[in-house]
Curated annotation (Swiss-Prot):
Keywords: 4Fe-4S, Iron, Iron-sulfur, Metal-binding, Oxidoreductase, PQQ biosynthesis, S-adenosyl-L-methionine
EC class name: oxidoreductase
Protein name: PqqA peptide cyclase
SUPFAM superfamilies membership: Radical SAM enzymes
Pathway the protein contributes to: Cofactor biosynthesis; pyrroloquinoline quinone biosynthesis
Gene label: pqqE
Organism of derivation: Klebsiella pneumoniae (strain 342)
GO biological process: pyrroloquinoline quinone biosynthetic process
Family: Belongs to the radical SAM superfamily. PqqE family.
Tree of life domain: Bacteria
């Protein structure tokens, strides 16, 4: 083993992407563009076996995601199995399809945590972004129902150029709903968000205003005794150093797609790397021995300027998926880094954002028809 290759720890966090089915059409969805090609889903028994193997390896947190995980009728059974194995369980949902009776069933099964996503602070923009006119009122009702059952009230808003200027109203809504934690996550440009980047990336001025709004509310809320935690995540497109993506490749996080492909991050399936299936190999073998999970572990794979950089142990060379999307090779330095020879790609994106006039209605919305059209066009 190379002296530059650190010991491999077990995956602490397992993300179960139960399905790509979803009633919404968000144009910033992180699901793959060709999700419509993925028709198969793991069975209840197969998912439980994945949970069992992950727990035996040392995983402690399990997220149920999608698509919309509520479309799986076996969700209570999966929650119960995960709880019986000792996982801390988190449901990541749009709230569409959620009912009070389902909440009661999830509680009885042992679900620990629910995170509900909103698209905006008002019904009109929420409907335009979600592609569902009834979504906003349903989300409000379910957020209140979650709070009434003493779950931690966790709300998520994906921010972009079309809703970031209403950030004060978003925070006011969170206060009204008595949220405990609020994730104000500026759009991360993978999947459908990358396809729509020119129409979604906020300007630098919008980001600066948003940072001030969050700072002002944190101060006011602290003064009034409101303990709501506001987590504001800015886009790395306006940073000069890359993020330490997923805490390092194959270091903490393991994702399993609906049909069973194991990934070191939920965007990695787009890379020209063969990732194994949980139906063909054990999770232990996948995590420790597979080529895909070892491809970008440690530092030996790094090109210059990453290899000799004194910050490599902090950012791990940045995001491999972002490097691939922007440069065509996942081996390259993340273009976010000002030291990268490809940093001009980020500068170009900033310039595009500064002059973009793309409206919400002009975005490419995530739906099965559009997905089928995209992959058929790419096969020509």
């Amino acid at each position: 083993m190379s002296q530059n290759k650190p010991a491999v720890n077990p995956p602490l966090w397992l993300l179960a992407e139960l399905t790509y089915r979803c009633p919404l059409q968000c144009p910033y969805c992180s699901n793959p563009l060709d999700f419509a090609r993925q028709e198969k889903e793991l069975t209840t028994e197969q998912w439980i076996e994945v949970f069992r193997q992950a727990r035996a390896m040392g995983s402690v947190q399990l997220g149920f995601s999608g698509g919309e995980p509520l479309t799986r009728k076996d969700l209570p059974e999966l929650i119960r199995a995960a709880r019986d194995l000792g996982f801390y369980t988190n449901l990541i949902t749009s709230g569409i399809g959620l009912t009070e009776s389902k909440l009661d069933a999830f509680s009885e099964a042992g679900l620990d945590h629910i995170q509900i996503s909103f698209q905006a602070s008002d019904e009109v923009l929420n409907a335009a972004l979600a592609g569902n006119k009834k979504a906003f009122q349903q989300k409000l009702a379910m957020a209140r129902a979650v709070k009434a059952r003493d779950y931690p009230m966790v709300l998520n808003f994906v921010l972009h150029r079309h809703n970031i200027d209403q950030l004060d109203k978003i925070i006011e809504l969170c206060i009204e709903l008595e949220a405990d934690d609020v994730e104000l996550a500026t759009c991360q440009f993978y999947g459908w968000a990358f396809l729509n980047r020119e129409g979604l990336l906020p300007t630098r001025e919008q980001i600066a205003r948003a940072e001030q709004v969050v700072a002002d509310y944190r101060q006011k809320m602290a003064a009034s005794g409101n303990l709501t935690n506001l987590l504001f995540v800015t886009p790395d497109y306006y940073e000069e150093r890359p993020k330490g993506c997923m805490g390092g490749w194959g270091s903490i996080f393991l994702s399993v797609t609906p049909e069973g492909t194991a990934l070191p991050c939920h965007s990695a399936r787009q890379l020209p790397v063969a990732f194994p299936s949980v139906l063909e190999q054990s999770l232990e073998s996948i995590w420790y021995d597979s080529f895909g999970f070892n491809r970008y572990r440690g530092y030996d794979w790094m090109p210059e300027p990453c290899r000799s950089c004194d910050e490599k142990e902090k950012d791990f060379g940045g995001c491999r998926c972002q490097a691939f999307m922007l440069t065509g090779s996942a081996d390259n330095a993340d273009p976010v880094c000002s030291k990268s020879p490809h940093h001009h790609k980020i500068l170009e994106a900033r310039r595009e954002a500064a002059c973009s006039d793309i409206k919400v209605s002009q975005l490419q919305f995530r739906n099965r028809t559009r997905s089928q059209l995209i992959y058929k066009t790419r096969e020509l």
